[in-house]
Amino acid sequence: MAFAGQDKRYAPSLLSFFIYNPKFGPREGEEEKKILFYHPNEVEQNEKIRNVGLCEAIVQFTRTFNPTKPAKSLHTQKNRQFFHEPEEGFWMVMVVKNPVAEKQKDGKTVLEYQEDELLDKVYSSVLQQCYRMYKLFNGTFGRAMEVGQVELLKDRLEKFFHRYLQTLHLHSCDLLDVFGGISFFPLDKMTYLKVQSFINRIEESLNIVKYTAFLYNDQLIWSGLEQEDMRILYKYLTTTLFPRYTEPELAGRDSPIRPEMPGNLQHYGRFLTGPLNLNDSEVKFRFPKIFVNTEDSYEELHLIVYKAMSASVCFMIDASVQLTVDFCRKLDSLVGPQLTVLASDICEQYNSNRRISGSEKEPQFKFIYFNHMNLAEKSTIHLRKTPNMSLTSVQPELMKILGDINSDFTRVDEDEEIIVKAMSDYWVVGKKSDQRELYVILNQKNSNLIEVNEEIKKLCATHFSNIFFLD
């Protein structure tokens, strides 16, 4: 991808991605057995073996300095390699081409590799995310080996990563990829209790439902899953599944999908996974399967995602249960009308809160907030985050500073605050306190350090006194 301008600039891109296990080909002449997956597949076998061997050597060499923490990345002029060992003996490697500026010098084209533009922490997080997404839909590498040996694992890796790697848009990765957080929808207590009551009623009526998650406007309201499992499921829902179905779904905008519902109940509900047509008894369908609690009970579940207007509910049911069209009809008739009413209530409450707060003028600051304890994330910098792109409302130079501040925070355990004045005269502030991180970009060119500090205090008091409920 080239950026417009006098000099051509090329964004970072994926050069190669591979997974290997050195124990699978320990003898000379068996090196190809180590390779479980390699992208791009067109690369000659000898080159694959050479690249894997080099990574193996780097890992072994760095182990001599720190046996428990071998290499995480390798910097070269043209590219950067990232290493991750998600399970013992299994190594994932991602090679990213450094950004390049193509300049004219004395009538000749000169390439300048801008290796400082890449942040290790961002792309290491992307690599870890690749594993977590694979694990969500396929389970662990080790379990595949137990069930069907190395051929089953290779087959699963090929099927998953062949498609998934196409959704990696490395040029738009940033601090949000490091956090991998969850955006929570702010609710008053009464409406939150309505949501809780709805979930309890449905779980009682459909007693085969094991876990439930409730989202509104792509933001989480309630989840019965463990945090780490919900974190990666949330990523899948908001960046892959929901964007496929985006359409105007405001209450009253269209006529109800099923106006014939008894008792004059409106019904906007539909399945986002599973059957498309409930009237066809012969229709073939299947729900995607997910794996949760892989460190403990190792559960395989059907994932049912059902939506009415802007509200979405995920129902997770044990994969051993056979789900029929009749069950889907029962779920549809039970959940559809109730979810439609609840979605309208949430919309009404949300709009009334917005009216009370008033239409304030555009603030002179933008921020990213992250809470490590509950994974709550909030950003006014990102306009949209999908697999295709991340639209940010600030310059790349400022995003880079945010990443640098975050890297500094990682190196120390204590609470701290960092204030930077950018070349463009913006103030960039990072604040780490009690498992929470706040990053603010202030557009106050004439302010001094004391005034900037005061602004940050005001911001914390108004925006972060209570992150989940609006009182």
From Swiss-Prot:
Any one Gene Ontology BP term: vesicle-mediated transport
Gene name of this polypeptide: ccz1
Coiled-coil residue windows: none
Compartments it resides in: Lysosome membrane
Protein name per Swiss-Prot or TrEMBL: Vacuolar fusion protein CCZ1 homolog
GO cellular component, one term: lysosomal membrane
Annotated InterPro entries: Ccz1, CCZ1/INTU/HSP4_longin_1, CCZ1/INTU/HSP4_longin_3, CCZ1/INTU_longin_2
UniProt family annotation: Belongs to the CCZ1 family.
Keywords recorded for this protein, A-Z: Lysosome, Membrane
